[in-house]
A protein has these predicted regions:
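Terminal end segments
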Residues: 377-379, 383-451, 455
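Substrate-recognition/specificity elements adjacent to catalytic centers across diverse enzyme folds
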Residues: 3-152, 161-165, 169-178
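Hydrophobic alpha-helical segments
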Residues: 299-409, 463-464, 478-485, 489-495
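A terminal-accessory region detector
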Residues: 92-109, 328, 447-497
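Glycine- and hydrophobic-rich flexible loops that cap the catalytic core of alpha/beta enzyme folds
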Residues: 121, 160-174, 178, 182-186, ...
């Protein structure tokens, strides 16, 4: 059963997306042979529990979608994971009437043409402090992901315990039978969003004599073509069926538009193992087992912070980074006529930016560059990663403040650990402070009232307490002086200015 059959025409694009990326094609081919038995049992048990709830509460569920099966759980993850790192934005741009601009230049990429007052900033934080930096010798982990209050990416809290050793509490997404982040009786972990380049768009050179052939390495190749039936609920029991062709090339799903024919390739394409990785993480009892679970690389993104009862702390810029040819602009639209742009391998997990038990005694990530997780580049190891990975070059104010507070205190008490988390100050080299300083420098006026306001900004202590009039004025002034290029600064520029 598909969403548009139950909820109507507005969900037809969702079902088209499911068909486009081949969710059910892959599951029907591979589920029985490739999903481990312990994961199948979890999926089946979860589906049975949902079905039981539905049977006992028929007035508050849509009976058309039941009964659920274990396969539906895996399908949910295959559907959701690419969404979590932005595939819907890529598809939306390709569906526009005019050819879209994909660019490594933040100024040119039309995704960033926004009003600064309407910026929807991602705001998760993870901070680990080890025994050597704690006043009482304890190890602490700040789990502070910021999710919506409702919807498909809202956290639901649960404590799960089983006879085979699972004992974990934490947050999970709707549709997940397992905790996605939290802690068991030995260790804990948390995520923050990162934004590596995990999606590539290729423009295909089509055969003028055959609309379903494209040029690849000097010869014409046929697109794979299948027809999917999209049934849409119109009124009551009345349904309308749309026949839609789905195309695929060697790269992945293909979209035929008036402004061109495009293929999409994304990290973790056709991977069904995400739930298995979460299970292995939840069952881990020490840092080695946790790293082994993470090395499955079935979760293509998220900064991950870890701490355990033995006093270990660990940070990794988790990302399924394709091994790409450095001669191409991977943020733009790529030529689809050559195997030089068709990646098939990924950077190994051990080579990702990461640090175990850093000399600094702590780590932090607040949606920022991974190489300053401790404030010192020398602490973070990585290998074989180049600019094609698209790793963030910026530092958020939260990250700068975490480095200042947690990094600057050699003996952090329990109270200080909590107080630092609720810090409400801008750092001197934050984008906000930089923009306001520029405004003050450039401002010219003889108006005494305006000059008084500027003087208020000059003396702002960068705090945002409720009674701080300068903070209110700075926030209102920010759109006047903000430049999107401020977010383009690399780490050296941000940390040095």
């Amino acid at each position: 059963m598909y969403k548009r059959q139950v909820y109507g025409v507005k969900y037809a694009p969702v079902d088209y997306y499911v068909a486009l990326i081949g969710v059910w094609e892959q599951i029907n081919k591979r589920y029985d042979n490739e999903i481990p038995q312990d994961i199948k049992k979890i999926c089946d048990a979860y589906a049975a529990g949902i079905n039981k709830y539905a049977s006992e509460n028929p007035k508050i569920v849509r009976s058309e979608i039941f009964p659920l099966k274990g396969k539906d759980v895996i399908a949910g993850w295959m559907y959701q994971i690419p969404y979590l790192y932005g595939i819907e934005k890529t598809l939306s741009k390709l569906f526009k009437k005019e050819k879209p601009v994909f660019s490594s230049d933040i100024i040119l990429d039309d995704e960033y043409n926004f009003d600064p007052l309407k910026i929807d900033l991602i705001g998760s934080n993870v901070i680990g402090v080890g025994p050597k930096k704690s006043a009482d010798g304890f190890t602490r982990l700040l789990v502070n992901t910021h999710q919506p209050w409702s919807g498909p990416t809202a956290w639901y809290e649960a404590h799960m315990k089983s006879e085979n050793g699972l004992n974990i509490t934490g947050g999970l997404f709707p549709g997940s039978p397992l905790v996605n982040h939290g802690h068991n009786d030995s260790l804990g972990w948390s995520f923050t969003s990162n934004s590596p380049d995990l999606i590539d768009v290729y423009e295909l050179e089509m055969n003028p004599l055959n609309e379903n052939e494209y040029l690849f390495d000097g010869s014409w190749k046929k697109l794979e073509v299948e027809e999917t039936k999209i049934k849409i609920k119109v009124l009551g029991p009345i349904k309308w069926t749309i026949n839609k062709k789905i195309y695929r090339s060697v790269h992945g799903p293909v979209l035929k538009q008036e402004h061109g024919t495009y293929a999409i390739r994304y990290s973790g394409i056709n991977d069904m193992r995400t739930l298995e990785q979460f299970y292995r993480m939840a069952k881990s009892k020490n840092i080695e087992e946790f790293k082994n679970a993470m090395s499955m690389q079935a979760l293509p993104m998220y900064n991950t912070g870890y701490a355990d009862k033995s006093g270990n702390i660990y940070y990794v810029y988790n990302a399924l980074l394709p091994v790409r040819d450095n001669d191409y602009d991977w943020r733009g639209i790529l030529p689809g006529n050559t195997s030089n742009t068709l990646w098939t391998d990924y950077i190994p997990f051990k080579d990702l930016p990461q640090v175990t038990n850093p000399d600094a005694g702590y780590f932090q990530n607040c949606n920022a560059n991974p190489f300053l997780a401790t404030g010192f580049r020398k602490d973070i190891s990585s290998f074989g990663i180049n600019e094609t990975a698209g790793i963030e070059g910026h530092q958020t104010n939260r990250s700068l403040r975490a480095i200042r507070l947690y990094g600057g205190d050699s003996s952090i008490t329990r109270e200080e650990f909590y107080n630092y988390k609720f810090d409400n100050q801008y750092e001197k080299n934050s984008v906000m402070a930089y923009a306001i300083d520029r405004f003050i420098e450039d401002f010219k006026s003889q108006d005494l009232e305006l000059l008084a306001a500027v003087d208020l900004l000059k003396n702002w202590n960068l705090r945002t307490d409720l009674d701080n009039r300068a903070a209110a004025l700075a926030i209102l002034t920010f759109p006047l002086t903000f430049d999107i290029a401020d977010y383009k600064h690399d780490v050296d520029h941000i940390t040095d200015r």
